[in-house]
């Protein structure tokens, strides 16, 4: 280290500009550039902040040179032992000012800086001190930094000598705050980044190289006074976190402070009420190496209970003991002196406490080395003061060691968690891995796991037999009854004290000896996993009855399985004597301590027992060991439980496969049916009326429905286009029909009608021009399969009842099931109509089928409707994009699914009755099973509201859909027109219900409307109604009128007419009718008859224009109510024709022109 003196203002002031031993002096001109050197060395421009920092650094350098010169010289003189003193003055050549009028300040600065560094280097090589810069030089450099920072940067990068840069860097480092290396971060990061081999070792092994360096620098430390030495030794241990290195430093440093010959350090261990001391390092001198001290302490472990010996007494009383003559003190143990030949004279033993005042260790020093025979008061005070700081360091080191152990424990548990899923099909490997990790972490000699076979236990206990059989263990099914024992009877027995954790209050009891023996005889273990030493492989065996009855370890395990409690046995011999067990001498002699814990499953049922046998250091298992071992037991239980679940899942999958095979066999059409359909002649499409939107299946028998499906495939040229074998197609159609349940509406015939509507939309509606052949195939398949295996209940019912389907599919429950059934049939042997498709085409058609079937969920319809309407409003006409095509197919599927609403009235009202009956059946189930009130459309008690609900269904779903479709594709207008016509019919019936009529009193919907009936020769006591059909001619009405005249009274309940309700009848007609009826009832003979009613109706109709848009429903209503009305048979519909023929022709012409234009 070099001191530099420079005259300033005529005075001589020495300045020390270095901060570390061995560094070289740096001229102040160079040091003023400290703030800019870091950035300039990397050739980056200086920012304004850098400029200001450089200026501040220059000023600080000058101030430091003047203000702290004397203190630095004193420190330098103390540290220098070679009498190297600084010169009193510097050379005048060291000073150099900037030439006046220099046109290039930057160049001047460069020249000046170069000159200064050159002179400094020459002076140092010549052994002469350098001179300090004047304040004027500092100001010039600061101004130069502000005006021309690029010039200084250029000089640093291009012309500065390496020596100057090195000194500049040293000066920057010296200006930084003093920072001692932190062992916390370095040690922990080193340990985490180390290889697995290093991680398995204690983290203290990484710090062996960083052992105390005090013996090497002893001469230097001896030159310090007592106060400085004390502080230096405190710094030496302040940041040390490796417990072994720390203890070694403490003993060596204490020897330096007190001139003690050797020392020992004991750390407190054990539970709060069972404390003992463990010799961390013993008999350490100032020349003892750390490795030797640690090795000796680990091989010759010394354990001293509190209150025993000198160290034990200090730990118990927390009082210092200073013995002048050890051999005269009864507490002194001279055995070690006799073994080593060393004679102990003076002993100073002092406790080490933490900030709470608890004992964490005891330090002991022996014999003085400076000729004194005893430790005086000064030694005691120094010892006490130093140990106060050492207590903080020891506690920090212990906390660090605990954090490292916790980190490793967490890593092990994380690996075990991964192993649970990696080894879920191999219980032996999983249990062996868990035992290996537990043995290494807890440092025990042996580890065992007993598994209980629960085949004969109560339901819910689980199984492990199948998992055991997978690794070759053939065990008998032995029941194990595990009972938790509660309550305490009498005083605590000696047995209970022994099996508790060491010196812990007994908290567990058994009911009686007989009860315990009885349970023990019933508990049997079927599998035993044993893991011995480090290089021993795991042993898996099936213990016999005799082995279980004679093995002490098995007896302890049975006790734990019976009570379900953890036991920590510190004296196995005492446990054996207490239980009068048959000794297995080899087993007992080698067993000292046992930690035994139950393994439970998710239902808290004991499925096994885990045991740890003998700690490696011979001490009992602690409460901390039990806590760690509990985590291993939990993971072991999770692994066994997961293995059981995996086994059960495999079994269930196997059962499902068998069930699917059986289902596939029974769900597939027979060979005889297939051959018969294959040989049948298929009529043309016109025979089945397939091209018409008014198609009905009422006239078709079951075989005809299959033939009609085949005809649709043929007409679309799908059989030849995709090379579908004809027998495969026939078998598939029959299998699809077979997989529909015989529910009232969502059955095979509904699927046929949906498929026919799709066929009519593609052919008659000319929508096939927007579809590829593969998409047409997918749409027809989807229509036929869209309600496969329908149960007659909707998605909401599946969710309410928490059915397996609802658990399997959370959204669109039934639709997903329909698609799965479709896939199941296609995968059945001889039913794959897609077998000739390429993989790409197969994926494409299956995607179309899935999307189309899921689109039949009305929730999906409402989700897609707005996007579809937006495309239509924007004038979309191509429909070839993937998303556009998906939207179009979804709307088409919904239109086909509800197409019954557009059928002719005689078909529609029958289908509505079927839908209503199916809904009412679901409502009955909701009342019976769920005890809830169903919605109106499923409530049988509100059946009269069905016409009104039909009108709402048409208005909300059907009409908006068909309107936008026919606006875009005018060839499907019949669907829209048919829906409008049926809406008028349903609205008419809804008005009848409001008048008090009942439309659905009968088992079938053939006679939905009630009419007036009166006999001329009988007195009218009330207005009676008879039921006639809607689609009937005059002869049919008269026939039905004669039949209904014999209808019993109880079948005509609710047939009173309420004149207070408004309906289709005009106000004038109701008034006239009311007056006529009541006037006729006042006479002896009534004059009311059907003709009288007809006359009033005719008068009312004559008063209104037949083309009025607001009256067709009323006219139609009265036409159906009049038995002899001439309009009742018009069109075979029983409705009054209110539109002129010319108007219909005009509409037809306009529609034809629009179609031709498109």
UniProtKB/Swiss-Prot annotation:
Residues 1148-1158 have a biased composition (Basic residues). Residues 242-394, 426-640 form the GAF domain. Residues 1041-1052 have a biased composition (Basic and acidic residues). It is a lipid-anchor. Keywords: Cell membrane, cGMP, Hydrolase, Lipoprotein, Membrane, Metal-binding, Methylation, Prenylation, Repeat. A divalent metal cation 1 binds at residues 750, 786-787, 897. Residues 670-993 form the PDEase domain. Its EC number is 3.1.4.35. The modification Cysteine methyl ester is found at residue 1155. Residues 30-71, 202-215, 1114-1130 have a biased composition (Low complexity). Binds 2 divalent metal cations per subunit. Site 1 may preferentially bind zinc ions, while site 2 has a preference for magnesium and/or manganese ions. Its cofactor is a divalent metal cation. The active site is at 746 (proton donor). GO terms for cellular component: cytoplasm; membrane; nucleus; plasma membrane. The keyword Hydrolase applies. A lipid is attached at residue 1155 (S-farnesyl cysteine). It is found in: Cell membrane. Residues 1156-1158 form a propeptide. A divalent metal cation 2 binds at residue 787. It catalyses: 3',5'-cyclic GMP + H2O = GMP + H(+). SMART domains: GAF, HDc. One of its GO terms (molecular function) is 3',5'-cyclic-GMP phosphodiesterase activity. Has a role regulating cGMP transport in Malpighian tubule principal cells. Belongs to the cyclic nucleotide phosphodiesterase family. Interacts with PrBP. This is cGMP-specific 3',5'-cyclic phosphodiesterase.
